[in-house]
Amino acid sequence: MTSIAHLRKSYERAELSEDASHADPLQQFEKWLKEAISAEIPEPNAMTVATVASNLRPSTRVVLIKGYDERGITWFTNYDSRKGQELAGNPYAALQFHWVELERVVRIEGIVEKVSEEESDSYFHSRPLDSRIGAWASPQSQVISGRSVLVANAAKYGAKFLLNPPRPPHWGGYRLKPDHWQFWQGRKSRLHDRLRYTLIEPASTLPDAKPVWIRERLAP
């Protein structure tokens, strides 16, 4: 075995206390995300998405969050991809943000559903032209003979659609509806701060109703 055990650092940038954290995990997430953006961390919107196949084999990939609100965390992708196929069979997933420079991790778990056709259309048409063509050109997660396949497909669909490609039927958005959040702040001596939020009562249909969360500290 090649040892890399010497690669270690002491986490001493900040702390995470119950008093200083929000009772609502979405507000705490928004606070940390804004701080990551302000710190000019490369791609602070990058998150790992973990799904599980029917044979119980997990898989992960990095995608970019495109929005969040009280309904959940939203991203867009190819529905025919491996993650799309796995979500079709098992709609539960986990997300993770790792902001290394701030010594922070956010973990989110919940059930995933597709966003509306209108929401997918709206985001798709806001993308750069080459990205919209790319959504047609790439048979995501399928084996191809070489990069030339992608180049040829991009040329074909670029010529076909010119400046106005429609959204492919196999492409759109997902939204994870959180029922579990964890916030991790690195601390000295590996005595890290971990706060877990568990949903105990979803928001009702009454106006201005808010979900009820229980917040607990976990040992690191």
UniProtKB/Swiss-Prot annotation:
Source organism of the structure: Albidiferax ferrireducens (strain ATCC BAA-621 / DSM 15236 / T118) (Rhodoferax ferrireducens)
InterPro entries: Pyridox_Oxase, Pyridox_Oxase_N, Pyridoxamine_oxidase_dimer_C, Split_barrel_FMN-bd
Residue numbers binding FMN: 61-66, 76-77, 82-83, 140-141, 184, 194
Protein name in UniProt: Pyridoxine/pyridoxamine 5'-phosphate oxidase
Function text: Catalyzes the oxidation of either pyridoxine 5'-phosphate (PNP) or pyridoxamine 5'-phosphate (PMP) into pyridoxal 5'-phosphate (PLP).
Listed Gene3D superfamilies: Electron Transport, Fmn-binding Protein, Chain A
Family: Belongs to the pyridoxamine 5'-phosphate oxidase family.
Signal peptide limits: none
Enzyme class per UniProt: oxidoreductase
GO molecular function per UniProt: FMN binding; pyridoxamine phosphate oxidase activity
GO BP, one annotated term: pyridoxine biosynthetic process
Catalytic activity: pyridoxamine 5'-phosphate + O2 + H2O = pyridoxal 5'-phosphate + H2O2 + NH4(+); pyridoxine 5'-phosphate + O2 = pyridoxal 5'-phosphate + H2O2
Residues bound to substrate: 8-11, 66, 123, 127, 131, 190-192
Cofactor(s) for this UniProt protein: FMN
Note on cofactor: Binds 1 FMN per subunit.
Protein EC: 1.4.3.5
HAMAP family with a match to the protein in the record: PdxH
Alphabetical UniProt keywords: Flavoprotein, FMN, Oxidoreductase, Pyridoxine biosynthesis
Subunit and interaction comment: Homodimer.
Pathway: Cofactor metabolism; pyridoxal 5'-phosphate salvage; pyridoxal 5'-phosphate from pyridoxamine 5'-phosphate: step 1/1; Cofactor metabolism; pyridoxal 5'-phosphate salvage; pyridoxal 5'-phosphate from pyridoxine 5'-phosphate: step 1/1
